[in-house]
C-alpha cells in the first residue's frame, strides 16, 4: 500500500520546478529500490541471533554517535532548508537519525538487562540518561526535534518496561517535557509553527507557516468517507508540500477517504498489539533483551505513526516525521524493515523455545 500511495502522491512532482528532471516514475522507482534493499537488510537482521545484537549494542551506539556527528560537519552533511540531516552516498542520502532510533532500541534494551540490579537507583539510571543526552544533543543540533522526541519516547518506554521505578520515570518524563518546551521557546520558527497550529486558517498563517496544515486538512476534508478515488487527489498537484513524505496520509484521506485512513490505523494497531504480545512472551521465557527489543520496535512505530497522523489531522504542530512503511524515504523504509526483521527474529526464537528446538541463524557462537 505504501508503494502505491508513494506513486500516487508523487506522480505530478516532475511537472514542478523543484523536480524538473524527475519523471512520473522517479519516486516510485527509487522507493522500490529502497524496499528491495530494506528486504535484504530485514533478512540479515532476522538471520542473526538476538544474542549477536545484544553483544554488539555498544558498538552500534558508537557508530550511531559517529554518524550523527559527521552529519554536522560542513562538507559531509547535506543542508536542506537550514537543517543538516543527511549524508550523501552517491545518488542517495542517508539519514542517521533513522539509524539512531533503531540503535537506541537495541542499546537501551541491552543496558537495561545488564543493569537490572541497579536500574531502580541513580547508579544505574544516570549512565543511560547521559548516553541518551549525547544522542539528543546531536539530533537537536541538526536540528531534528521530531526524531529527538521519538528517541526519547523509545528509551523511556524500554526503561519503564524494563523495571524503572515510577519516581525516576516521572523525573525523566518531566525532563523530556521541559526539553520540548525549551526547544520550542528558543527557536522562532518553532514558535511560528506552534501559533500556526493553533489557528492555521487565519490570514496571518494560512499562506505562511500554516500552509501545509491548511492544505492537509483540506485534502482530508475533500476525501469524506470513501474518498475521491485512487489517483484523483487535487492537493497533491503542487498545493500540498511534501505530499509523498510527511503528509502522505492527507493524500490517503483525500483519495481513499475515512475508510482508507481507518485501514491504515488498523494495520498499525494490529502491528503494535502483536509486537507487544511477542515481547511479553519473550520476557515470560526469561528472554528480557528479546522482549524489550520487540516492544521497543513497536513503540517506535506506534509513536511515530501517532505523531505523523496527528500532524496531518491538525492534532499536533507540524513536525517532519515520516509514516513508517508508507511515506517515501530510503533511510526510513530500510531502517524500519531492519527493525521489523528484529521483531520477526524475536517471534521466531520464541516459537523455537516453546517447541524445544534450537533457533537457526548465522553465527553458531551466538546461537
From Swiss-Prot:
Taxonomic source organism: Taylorella equigenitalis (strain MCE9)
MF (Gene Ontology): lipid-linked peptidoglycan transporter activity; peptidoglycan glycosyltransferase activity
InterPro entries, per database record: Cell_cycle_FtsW-rel_CS, FtsW, FtsW/RodA
Its biological purpose: Peptidoglycan polymerase that is essential for cell division.
Main localization (coarse): membrane
Reactions accelerated catalytically: [GlcNAc-(1->4)-Mur2Ac(oyl-L-Ala-gamma-D-Glu-L-Lys-D-Ala-D-Ala)](n)-di-trans,octa-cis-undecaprenyl diphosphate + beta-D-GlcNAc-(1->4)-Mur2Ac(oyl-L-Ala-gamma-D-Glu-L-Lys-D-Ala-D-Ala)-di-trans,octa-cis-undecaprenyl diphosphate = [GlcNAc-(1->4)-Mur2Ac(oyl-L-Ala-gamma-D-Glu-L-Lys-D-Ala-D-Ala)](n+1)-di-trans,octa-cis-undecaprenyl diphosphate + di-trans,octa-cis-undecaprenyl diphosphate + H(+)
Lineage per the UniProt record: Bacteria, Pseudomonadati, Pseudomonadota, Betaproteobacteria, Burkholderiales
Keyword Zinc-finger: no
Subcellular location: Cell inner membrane
EC number(s) recorded for this UniProt protein: 2.4.99.28
Keywords: Cell cycle, Cell division, Cell inner membrane, Cell membrane, Cell shape, Cell wall biogenesis/degradation, Glycosyltransferase, Membrane, Peptidoglycan synthesis, Transferase, Transmembrane, Transmembrane helix
UniProt similarity note: Belongs to the SEDS family. FtsW subfamily.
Cellular compartments per GO CC: cell division site; plasma membrane
Keyword Phosphoprotein: no
Membrane-spanning parts: 32-52, 57-77, 87-107, 119-139, 149-169, 171-191, 251-271, 296-316, 323-343
Pathway involvement of the protein, from the record: Cell wall biogenesis; peptidoglycan biosynthesis
Bilayer disposition of the protein: Multi-pass membrane protein
Pfam families the UniProt entry points to: FTSW_RODA_SPOVE
Protein name (database record): Probable peptidoglycan glycosyltransferase FtsW
GO biological process per UniProt: cell wall organization; FtsZ-dependent cytokinesis; peptidoglycan biosynthetic process; regulation of cell shape
